[in-house]
A protein has these predicted regions:
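N-terminal, positively charged/glycine-rich alpha-helical extensions of SAM-dependent methyltransferases
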Residues: 1-31
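Conserved alpha-helix/loop element of class I SAM-dependent methyltransferases that forms part
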Residues: 40-59
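Class I SAM-dependent methyltransferase SAM/SAH-binding core
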Residues: 65, 72-109
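Conserved SAM-binding strand-loop segment of SAM-dependent methyltransferases
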Residues: 107-118
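A short SAM/SAH-binding and catalytic strip from SAM-dependent methyltransferases
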Residues: 125-144
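Short "lid" loop at the C-terminus of a central beta-strand within the Rossmann-like core
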Residues: 133, 167-172
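Conserved beta-strand signature within the Rossmann-like core of class I S-adenosyl-L-methionine
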Residues: 158-166
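Class I S-adenosyl-L-methionine
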Residues: 174-217
């Protein structure tokens, strides 16, 4: 069973990476290049995540792993907010074009980028913004299993909290290659398998949820 799951993950990752490579070639390092509608919506989602981390952290310096980092927009926002001296940032993505772009264009001592779906060591916070929205499969069962198993891997490596956002609808579904979850379902999944789960919404993002799962201190 593990072997089959591993093969499925590899195939899904290859399909996702192929779609993003084509998109990035057409739109470069813009919100459209990573399937976001606009700079406003992309940056709002990322700022919500940063604000959540800042509300939780107590230490002077923290480490963040950004899963599905794309062209590194989260790090750019961290710099724009003058937080770069406070944060050790690790950007991860399954797409080599994104990682290559980030390595060439972002050169900071406390920043690194690498291929992967989870960090190579424990960090304080692991975040995913839009990472599981776009899906190459129409099978809800296959995709939710993929998402859950990725969350499990990252939960083990998050020292303080796991924070991610997702699209929501009244019913869980895949529509136009986008995965929509349902509020009560995703909250129950996270609480039953991980820990205390906080759901937050923003009035400018009516179809989004931001989910924060905190580790016991």
């Amino acid at each position: 069973m593990f072997f089959i799951n591993n093969i499925i993950h590899i195939l899904l990752n290859k399909q996702i990476s192929k779609v993003y490579s084509k998109r990035f070639t057409n739109y470069n390092n813009t919100p459209k290049g990573v399937f976001w509608n606009s700079t406003l919506s992309q940056d709002l989602r990322l700022n919500i995540i940063i604000n959540k981390i800042l509300s939780l952290c107590k230490q002077n310096t923290i480490s963040i792993a950004d899963i599905g980092c794309g062209y590194g927009r989260l790090w750019n926002i961290i710099k724009e907010r003058n937080l770069e001296t406070k944060i050790n940032y690790y950007g991860l993505d399954i797409n080599k074009d994104f990682i290559s772009f980030c390595q060439k264009n972002i050169n900071c001592q406390n920043v690194s980028f690498e291929l992967g779906t989870f960090p190579s060591k424990k960090v304080d916070y692991i975040v995913m913004s839009g990472t599981y929205n776009l899906t190459p499969t129409n099978s809800l069962k296959v995709w939710e299993k993929y998402v859950f198993e990725n969350l499990c891997l990252n939960w083990k490596l998050a020292d303080k909290a796991l924070i991610f956002n997702c699209l929501i609808n009244q019913n869980r579904q895949i529509k136009n290659s986008l995965y929509f979850t349902e509020l009560l379902w995703i909250k129950e999944l996270c609480e039953n398998n991980f820990g205390k789960t906080e759901i937050s919404k923003h009035n400018l993002l009516p179809n989004d949820l931001t989910i924060t799962i905190k580790k016991l201190s």
